[in-house]
Amino acid sequence: MNTNDAKEYLARREIPQLFESLLNGLMCSKPEDPVEYLESCLQKVKELGGCDKVKWDTFVSQEKKTLPPLNGGQSRRSFLRNVMPENSNFPYRRYDRLPPIHQFSIESDTDLSETAELIEEYEVFDPTRPRPKIILVIGGPGSGKGTQSLKIAERYGFQYISVGELLRKKIHSTSSNRKWSLIAKIITTGELAPQETTITEIKQKLMQIPDEEGIVIDGFPRDVAQALSFEDQICTPDLVVFLACANQRLKERLLKRAEQQGRPDDNVKATQRRLMNFKQNAAPLVKYFQEKGLIMTFDADRDEDEVFYDISMAVDNKLFPNKEAAAGSSDLDPSMILDTGEIIDTGSDYEDQGDDQLNVFGEDTMGGFMEDLRKCKIIFIIGGPGSGKGTQCEKLVEKYGFTHLSTGELLREELASESERSKLIRDIMERGDLVPSGIVLELLKEAMVASLGDTRGFLIDGYPREVKQGEEFGRRIGDPQLVICMDCSADTMTNRLLQRSRSSLPVDDTTKTIAKRLEAYYRASIPVIAYYETKTQLHKINAEGTPEDVFLQLCTAIDSIF
């Protein structure tokens, strides 16, 4: 079954409406036993005649007291005996069937039912006309989404839509509407508004502005399900801007905003819940858009003008590119992708400018996830080409359940992805420049976050390549618990590389090339090793022996941090 089949099945069976109704019932009823409650709800769905009979409020009781069971005539008579006077002259009419009860629903309580149905039926954008460019701006609460979205809209002449503001205005204008009163309570507690309701409001707004060249949507989607719904019912966005900010900074900004603006969802309890929702949903959402090559990440823990400068560079490159096409993968010199064991001289002028010019992908990408990263065991493995790092990392992964990350491999994977970032990296390499440390660190962080919860720690080889990288890693993520130096002579490494050359014939494993690589390694690694020696994190391993002997030394060193 492919994605379209799955989507068609869910839509045909009314599954989204069923789940929305069940969730609304859970949030309103707050049952002690949610499993038993859901079983009773599903039984009611069968009695109603299927999912197509379920409304969003089917399981939302108008009163909180439980009605007695009505299982047949005997139960009805027992109920009537309990609540009616014994006097036979009491004037009441007996019905063979209870009169219809006016059940609250979106159709009966609002005047939007026909509009909502039309929105489901028709395309949002006229297929005969060019579709406006769509930019989605996402990030944690307090990350500056509204500020940056407005700046983007103003710079490019786009229309700005704040999903949060759409919902707040709707709640304010329909305060007597039971559905929106319920949504107001949901939002006030820090939970997400119902997905279909939010999508409907966005679609209504988009239909009102069909002639816009571009649209910036702030605060949507919040999770992968919303992203799928947006693509299914509206379109695939042209660009997703992710504003990453440290968790503590988000809290500070939200508390300050609560004092200044008094938004109902900025209360302390709701703030905690919103941050928790963001933490749970952000990584899968970012990964989803990364796989589609749509997202760019920005460090939002800076001055807003600095952040916007980086965003505007990215938007210019993505939506208004130069006419020259980027080189294809076949045009790229493979030698410009670093070997996983190679540490190179980073003295290029471009590298010195990297942090300023290439902050497009951010320096603090995962907000609250950084706290989880800092709790993980992080081990750097430093060693020259041919020192045996790759072999030993494989064995350590198997023994300890670590995740092995190689900066060279991460760069290769990124270049193969054909993302916007890969185009930028390719352009840099084609000019003969080195990939800036900011991009390498960003690739590392994304890979680490993707493995959170499934690993006991990280083995990182080929990094840091200079002291500045190590300092930046410590500042942005945290210092490693252990730095292992694979101490091996130049002669041993040369012999190993020559043997590998005879078996696999890599282009650069000639004697002359090997000598250059070793020279570059020693020149760059000596300051790095000295830096970690002063921090008492360095553990030197004699890598001259057999793989088994080296592995035993490594295990002894790693066991010391557990």
From Swiss-Prot:
Brain specific. Its EC number is 2.7.4.3, 2.7.4.6. Keywords: ATP-binding, Cytoplasm, Kinase, Nucleotide-binding, Transferase. Residues 133-316 are annotated as: Adenylate kinase 1. One of its GO terms (biological process) is pyrimidine ribonucleotide biosynthetic process. NCBIfam families: aden_kin_iso1. Monomer. Interacts with YWHAZ. This is Adenylate kinase isoenzyme 5. It comes from Homo sapiens (Human). The lineage of its organism: Eukaryota, Metazoa, Chordata, Craniata, Vertebrata.
